[in-house]
Structures are given as structure tokens and as C-alpha cells.
Amino acid sequence: MDIISIVLLVLLVVLVVAFIFCAQNIKKNKQDAESLFNEAENKANEVMASAKREAESLKREAEAFKKEARYTLREEEQKQRREIEDEFKQERQELKETEKRLKQREEILDRKDDTLTKKEENLDSKEENLVRKTDTLSKREEQLAHIEEKKRLELERISNLSMDDAREIILSETRDGLTKEMAQTIRQSEEKAQAEADKRAKNIISLAIQRVSSDSVAEQTVSVVNLPDDGMKGRIIGREGRNIRTFEALTGIDVIIDDTPEAVVLSGFDPIRREIARMTLEQLVQDGRIHPARIEELVEKNRKALDHKMREYGEQAAFEVGAHNLHPDLMKIMGRLHFRTSYGQNVLDHSVEVAHIAGNLAGEMGENEALAKRAGFLHDIGKALDHEVEGSHVEIGTELARKYKENPIVINTIASHHGDTEPLSNIAVLVAAADALSAARPGARRESIENYIKRLKDLEAISTSFDGVETAFALQAGREIRVMVKPDKLTDDQIVILARDVKNRIEDEMDYPGNIKVTVIRETRAIDYAK
């Protein structure tokens, strides 16, 4: 066998072996492929089954959610229906109450109308009486003229006096008689009017005052800040006093640090600055960080906080007295009065008290109670700005009321409550009276000893300046002046006129809270000795 044949045989064997090997691989691959296909098909079936189960689960959940949503919607609908029914019932009840109040108001108006009708009838009757009295006086004047003419002729006939001499005698007699009659008439009229006025005024004032309850404690000019321990005083002073100097410079308040245990005193005449200082110092003590930068930060912060607090004070006071629909700026200005004092009395508390007293007086007198309260509440509003704006607190308050378009009666009340202008309504007079009552009640106000002594001296000086006065004494803390006259200089009739003159001088020349009683005493003593 040649080499070529051997090679071909070898190649043939190799090909056969390769063919057999390939056939085996193909069969194996086919089996693997079938296995993979079956496995994939099984997984696909599992996925389909899982998806189907998931879909059924989601469907069940959707059904459950749908039922729950339908139930929730039904409950919400029922709840809204109940709320609407409750609101309807409440509105119907409010409507019934409103109708009831309107009916009561109508009855009150009917009663007032009947009262006015009766007053008109009384006025007509008084007018008729006045006409009759006028006619009677005219006839009396004619009779007196006739009698005077007869007297003149008789005097001329008897005394042979001239017309001028007779006239002088008659005038002298008439003048003396009229002086005595005038003094008696004045005394009787005053006694009668005083008795009736005192009785009526005491009744009205007692009814008004007993419905008002107020504090009788006057405001102080110092505030006390408590400290956790005395070691805090050194921290407040600071190194070389820099903390206390910064505090006093920023607040304008004196810080008094003495031997008082665990306390620091803040002294200053301006309550607003003193309140800012008190708030700042309390926060510094509580925080513990006391240095100039922190002091400056807290002072500025508390200034803004106090502005907000003043508005709250004004709103609360306006609500208390029933002064509705006040301009927000007016309420803020009224809130400033919480930090103002007059003779030691808190001006906002005084305004609230005047509002209540004026309202009670107006109710007793048949005037508009709400308007009287509003006017009384605003009567001292000018005191909130009298340090910042030129003019008296009356002028400032009047301009503020005009600016914010208050009722003309309120404007006139503010302008007239110290007698600067003429009161144009009964409410203005009632507010002035309420102002005097609030200021004059015991404990409401406090005067310095210098002003107190000066007022007593001025009172005695006015009384002793009249002719015939021997001496005068101011009694009861200046609420009464007793004038002793010389009996040989003034008669009993003349001291009645003297009392009125002293009273007028005091009203014109002095400012004082409340009333001053003027008592003139004429005493005659006859002395002899038995030997």
C-alpha cells in the first residue's frame, strides 16, 4: 500500500470519527435545547399562573376598595347632611332670637314714644302756665307803676320835695329792700335747688357708682425685678460698669442696685420706657447672657413686642366697655394709655372706669348708653400723644377723633370735658361728671406733697382776698374752705353773695379734682363782765 492510500485511509478514518462525534454533539445539543425549551415553557406557565393570581388579588382588592370608598362616601354625605341640618337649626334659632330682640326693642321704642308724648303734654301745660304768669306779671307791673305815681305825687304834696330828691329817696328805699329781698330769694332758691339737686344727683350717682368696681391702687414710678441670687447684680453691672451704662443709655431708665436682697429697682417717670427696661432685664437674667450687644438686641425686640402688646391692651379695653368698630389705630393709641398715669392713676383704667360710669349715668338719665360709653372711653385719648405732639391733650384728642371720623357728640365731649369749649349734648356733661367722679374717688389719684401744699395755700389766698374776710382755713385735704368774716363789715345777706363770689374765683383760677365746698361763717359775740 502506498503512502497516498495510507493518508487517504487515515483521513477517511478521521472524517468518520469526526462525523460520529458531531452527530453525538448535535443529538446532545438537541436534547439540551428541548430541556431548555421545556424549562422555559414551565417558567412561562408559572409566570402566567402567578400573574393570573396577582390579577385576581388586585381585582379583589379593587372591589374591596370600591366598597370601602362607597361606604366612606356615604358616611361623609350623611355627616355633611347632619352638619347642614345643624347649621340650619342654629341659624333658625338665631333668627328667632333676633326677632325676639327686635320685638323687645320695638316695645322699648313704644314706651319711649309714650314718654315723649307725656313730656310734650307737660311742656304744653307749662307753656300755658307761663303765659298766664306773664299776663299776671304785666298786670302787676301796671299796678306798681300806678302805685308809684300816686306815691310820688303824695310825697311831693307832703314834703314839698323836688322830683329829683323824691326819686333819690324812693330809689334808696327800693334798693335796700331789693337787696334784702334778693339775698333772701337767692338763699331760698339755692336751698331748694340744692336740696332737690343733691337728692336727685345722689340717687343717680349712687346707682351708677355701685355698678362699677375698680381698683383703688395708684400706679408707682418704679418697677422691681427679682434676681435668682445676689451674684447676678455684678453681672448686671458688668466689667467697669459697661453693662449697666449701656442698659441705662438704651432704655432711659435708672437702674438702682442697693442692699435689697435678690432684687433690682428700675426707676423712671415714663411707664413705657420702664416696661421695656423691665422686660429686657428679666429676659437678660433668665437667659444669663448679659453684654452690651445682647442688651441692645433685647431692647429693640421688646420695643416691637410692646407695640403689639399696646394694641392688645386697647382691643381688650374697647371690648370691655363695648366700644365697637373703633379704628385699629385708635385702639393702639388707647393701648398706650396703659403705660400713662395721671396723678398716679393708670389712664387706660381711668378711661374704662369713666366709660362705665358715663354709661350708667346715661342709662339712668335716658340717654344713649353706648354712645356715652364710647365718648367716656375716648375722652383722654390725647394723653397718649401729648409728649410727641404740640398742644394740650384735649386739642390732640379732638383732632384724633376728627381724623378717624368719630361721632360729632364724641368729638364735642373730648373737646369740652375740661371746660375748654361749651358742651353741646347731655352726654358731654355726663362724661365730664364721670371723669370728675373717677378722679375724685378715694385712692384713685395721688398728688405730690408740693402740689398739695401749693393748692391749699392758693385756696386760702383766694378766700382772704375779699373785703371783710378775717381769715380762711382749708380743710379735708383741700375739699372744703371755711371763710371767717368780720361781723361789723358784712351782713348775713351779704355773706350769701360772698360765698358765690369765692366759689366763682376758685372755679376760674384753680385746677382741682372733684368739688370744693365753700362755707362762709359770720359770728357775733357780745362780752361783758359781772363785777
Curated annotation (Swiss-Prot):
Gene expressing this chain: rny
Pfam families listed in its UniProt record: HD, KH_1, RNase_Y_N
Protein family: Belongs to the RNase Y family.
Class in the EC hierarchy, top level: hydrolase
Annotated EC: 3.1.-.-
InterPro entries, alphabetized: HD/PDEase_dom, HD_domain, HDIG_dom, KH_dom, KH_dom_type_1, KH_dom_type_1_sf, Ribonuclease_Y, RNase_Y_N
Record NCBIfam families: HDIG, RNase_Y
Transmembrane feature ranges: 3-23
Protein's recorded name: Ribonuclease Y
Keywords for this protein: Cell membrane, Endonuclease, Hydrolase, Membrane, Nuclease, RNA-binding, Transmembrane, Transmembrane helix
PANTHER family given in the database record: RIBONUCLEASE Y
Domain KH: 221-281
Protein localization: Cell membrane
HD domain residues: 347-440
